[in-house]
Amino acid sequence: APDDYYDLVFVVVQAGQLPDVLPVLKANKSQYFVFVGNNPQAKQVLEFMQRPADKIAFGFQGTAGRREHDHVVSVYASAGMTVGGATTPLSGTFRTRLKTAFDGAKYKLTFYGDMDEWLKCHIAFVLPACYVCYACNGDLHRATKQQRGAILDAAYEACLMLKDAGIPVNDANNTDNFQPGTSARRKMEAMVFTMTKTPLGRLCVSDHAMHAVSEMKYLDEAFDALRRQTGTAMPMWEKLRNEMPSWDSLQQNRKAAK
C-alpha cells in the first residue's frame, strides 16, 4: 500500500517484470529501494522512480541454483552482493543503512560506483553463454572448444559495443579479460572450460538459462536495441544468436516442461 513504510525495500524480480511493479513502488512512501538482479535499464528505472539518485540502488547477488519439486538447490562461494547507484556511488547514509541491515549476517557488501555499467557488462558475458547453452539444449558439456572461445569473443564485441554507446566500461574488469591473446583471456578460457565441464556450470548457467527463457529474451532484446543504435559490428555475437533455437520455440519448450 502507498502508506506502508519500510527502512529498505528490496525488489527481487526479473527485469522484464519490473514494468508491472514499478508504479506500485513509485507510489510507496518508503525512501530507499534496492533493485536486485540482471537489469539492462538501471538509468530508466531510476528516472521512473522519481527519487534522488542516492535513494535508489541496484545490486547483484552472486548466487545460483535451481528449483526441484519440493526444494531449492542453491550454490554460492560466499553470500554477498555488489551494489551501488545507477551511475554514481551511494551516499554514506545509504551505505550505512545497508551495512546495518546485514550486520552479523556474514553477508559481504561490495560497493560499486556505476551499477548501470556493471550490470550491462555482466549481461555482455551472460548472454553469449546462454546462446551456447540453448544451442546445446541445456547441456554445456556438449559445448565445443570453438563455442567456448566464441563466448569470450562475443563478450569482447559486446564490451566494444557498450563503449560505442557511451557506457564507461571498466576495461580492467571486462574488456581486457576477453581480448584475444592476453594472459587475462587465457584465465577466462580456463574458467569457461570449468564452467562447461563441471556441475558448477549447470548451476550458474544452464539451470538459469533453461528456466528463465523469458528473462534472457528480455535481456537479448535490450542489448539488440543498443546494438542497433551503435551499429557496432558483432559477427561472433550474431553467429551465436543464429545457432540457437528461436525464442518462441524455447518458450514453448519451457511451457511444455512445466
What are these regions (language model features)?
Residues 91, 147, 151, 212, ...:
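Aromatic-acidic/polar surface patches that form glycan- and anion
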Residues 97, 101, 149-164, 218:
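A non-catalytic, amphipathic alpha-helix used as a structural packing/dimerization or gating element
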